[in-house]
């Protein structure tokens, strides 16, 4: 709705008028595949930390504070968080396609076209949740005649907003309170994220060891990389699926930020090239997202100095975010320049945000928090965010270093926050220009690798352990 209103206002001085019509794409798309309405299942409190009833109390307080009688939730991930449910409607995000509404008296309605299992039916009945088909939303609002409904213009489709306007006496346009509650992870969710990142780190480290023992003669390609990573993650406890389609781009493909290899466009790995691997996993206790840039087969051919320089500048920016401390109230765009500084010094930059929010067994991209030039959300305690500066030279190579971080209070100063790094996997030392790092940056690299080794070594065997020890060996200036 917000985008529609913005567009409408931009042409207000013209004679253009708007008319509602049926979606033309739906009329033309004759062989449209059926939506995957998977079974809804309950997400256990041992992973969520808060029961549905506890979350309901938080939301009702917000409804009362805003002097409203209901809250309409248009984002499926907010409904899934609020009701502690998940589904498999999408390939990489455990979502249920749905809308929901909660009244200040505690009545809850979920609108979806899913068949409900007996277990979920019982769960809904016990928690005063009524399930209705999406097609009944207009009739529902017509019969209810709410006096004042909260809904978020940024996330509510125009058609649904029109129904609310038509049948509610009044409304309030505010950010959905679920979004911020969901973004600020509780202690159980943070503990789950830490544990999930250990297992994910085991899979990724075993992958890096495997790759380091290959050569150009093995004729590996980008799809081989995707398949190997998936096989290793599938062995880990609580793994459900990748958290997004793996990006494995070598050479010029690495410069395509959201590259996807397929059988018609799939490069072989060559010595001296860089391989950018951006991947992640959905685990019952957390969601991961990690990028490593790897110098391919360095024993056969060294990477050139330009690539090492660019990698080191990206690393310096990554470290700057990881080590930042900031006052409560700081917003994402205030932190973003820290990551770009060392590239900008050379007239370079990257055309994406430095960090996005990440869910807890939900979306790998989650708002409202971000570290970017557009990031206006205050960074709050418990928010999990990616730290992923990069550099991309078109038609040649791409570099990105990504760890997930969680905002936490500083031990000695409750008025300031800092970040704790969650991701555990070696950073390729073959690409670091050590003489470009200052003492504090070297200390960070060594401390990070020390933590990686201490945490993951117990899961490595024989040659894997020897390789990990060497990969995490301290660098000296």
Residues covered by each model-derived region:
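Active-site neighborhoods and metal-handling regions in enzymes and metal-associated proteins
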Residues: 1-477
């Amino acid at each position: 709705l917000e985008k529609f209103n913005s567009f409408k206002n931009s042409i207000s001085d013209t004679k253009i008028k708007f008319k509602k019509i049926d979606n033309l794409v739906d009329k033309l798309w004759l062989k449209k595949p059926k939506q995957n309405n998977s079974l809804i299942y309950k997400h256990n409190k041992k992973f969520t930390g808060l029961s549905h009833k506890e979350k309901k109390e938080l939301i009702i307080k917000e409804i009362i504070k805003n002097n409203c009688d209901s809250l309409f939730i248009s984002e499926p991930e907010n409904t899934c968080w609020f009701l502690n449910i998940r589904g498999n409607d999408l390939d990489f995000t455990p979502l249920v396609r749905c809308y929901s509404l909660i009244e200040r008296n505690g009545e809850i309605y979920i609108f979806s076209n899913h068949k409900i299992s007996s277990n979920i039916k019982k769960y809904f009945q016990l928690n005063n949740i009524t399930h209705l088909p999406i097609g009944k939303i207009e009739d529902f609002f017509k019969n209810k005649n709410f006096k004042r409904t909260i809904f978020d213009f940024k996330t509510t489709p125009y058609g649904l907003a029109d129904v609310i306007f038509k049948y509610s006496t009044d409304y309030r346009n505010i950010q959905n309170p679920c979004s911020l509650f969901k973004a600020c992870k509780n202690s159980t969710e943070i503990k789950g994220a830490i544990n999930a990142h250990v297992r994910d780190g085991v899979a990724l480290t075993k992958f890096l060891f495997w790759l380091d023992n290959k050569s150009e003669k093995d004729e590996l390609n980008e799809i081989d990389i995707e398949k190997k990573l998936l096989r290793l993650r599938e062995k880990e406890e609580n793994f459900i699926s990748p958290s997004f389609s793996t990006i494995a781009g070598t050479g010029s493909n690495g410069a395509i930020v959201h590259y996807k290899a397929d059988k018609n466009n799939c490069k072989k790995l060559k010595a001296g090239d860089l391989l950018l691997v951006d991947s992640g996993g959905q685990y019952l206790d957390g969601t991961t997202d990690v990028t490593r840039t790897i110098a391919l087969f360095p024993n056969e051919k060294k990477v050139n100095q330009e690539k090492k320089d660019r990698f080191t500048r990206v690393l310096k920016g990554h470290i700057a975010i990881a080590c930042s401390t900031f006052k409560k109230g700081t917003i994402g765009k205030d932190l973003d320049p820290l990551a770009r500084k060392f590239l900008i010094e050379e007239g370079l930059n990257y055309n994406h945000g430095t960090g996005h929010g990440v869910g807890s067994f939900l979306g790998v991209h989650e708002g409202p928090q971000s570290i970017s030039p557009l990031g206006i959300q205050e960074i709050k305690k418990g928010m999990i965010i990616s730290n992923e500066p990069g550099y991309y030279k078109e038609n040649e190579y791409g570099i990105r270093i990504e760890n997930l971080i969680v905002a936490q209070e500083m031990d000695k100063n409750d008025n300031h926050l800092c970040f704790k790094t969650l991701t555990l996997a070696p950073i390729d030392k073959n690409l670091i220009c050590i003489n470009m790092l200052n003492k504090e940056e070297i200390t960070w690299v060594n401390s990070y690798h020390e933590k990686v080794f201490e945490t993951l070594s117990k899961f490595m065997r024989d040659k894997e352990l020897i390789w990990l020890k060497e990969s995490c060996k301290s660098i000296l200036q």
